[in-house]
C-alpha cells in the first residue's frame, strides 16, 4: 500500500499538481452570443470521424480512474474552475508564457489536481490518433467530468457538444471570478448570480464538495485561534474540529496535505455533504455557511433528507454550468496540443 492509499484510508492524502510549461499565444477575446449553449448539440460530432468520441473518452477515463480514483473530484473541480471564469472554454488548461500569467497559475488555482489535467491529456491523445484536430479540449473536459463522476456513483446525463477552445487565459480573471473558502452566502449569491445562477442553483453546485478535497490551509482559521474567546469556529462540531486538528497540526504542517471535504463518504457522490453541514461538519466556511445562514438552510435540510432530490437538481445545474459562456461556430479554435496547454 503506497502513501496515497494510506492517506485515503485516513481521509487525508498528499496532492502535488505538476506544472506544465508550454507556450501560449495571445489572441482576441471572443464573446459568445448564446447564454447557455443554444448552439451546442448532443450529436455535434455525428458526421465526423470522431462520432465515437464518447466511447473513446469513457474508456480512457476508466483507465485513469483505476490508476487514480481521486481524478473524479479533481476533474470536477477543474471543470468548475474553467466554466466559472469566462465560460467553459478550456482556458484553465492553457499554460503561462513569459508575457502572460495564465489562469492555472493564479493563486486560487495552484491546488488544481495534476491528475485532472492528465485525464484531459489522455483523452485528447486518444482522440487525436483517430481524428486529429476535430474535438475541442473544452468538450473533452465536459465529457470526462461526467464520465468520472459516474464512476463514484454520480448521475450520468447527456453532454451537449460543440464548444471551442479559447486562445486567452489570464490569472487575474480567475482571481476575480472564483469563490474563496471564506465566502458568505451573500458573497456566493453575488458571484453565482453574476454567472446567471440562482441561490438555489448555487447551493446545488456546492454539493460537488461531496467528493472534493482541500488543503489544510484553507480552513486552519476555523480550528485554531478562531477568536480571542474560542479556539474553534462555534459553528463547527467540537469533536469534528478535534478530528481535523489531528490531520492538520498547526506546527510543522505539510503544505501538501489535503483532507476530504466529506469525511463520511468521500468516495461516493451523494447528499452526505449536506447531512454533514447539518451536524456542524462542514469543513470550509462556505460549506457551513449554507446551513448557518437562514437564507439557504431550508434547501440544505431538504437535500440532507433526499439524495434523489439533490441528484435530480444537480443534473440540471451541472448541464447549465457546462453550457456557460461557450465559444461556438468560428469563435476560438480547436486546440491541437495533446496536453491542451498551448494555442495553435
What do the PLM-derived regions correspond to, one by one?
Residues 25-344:
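Catalytic cores of secreted/periplasmic or lumenal enzymes
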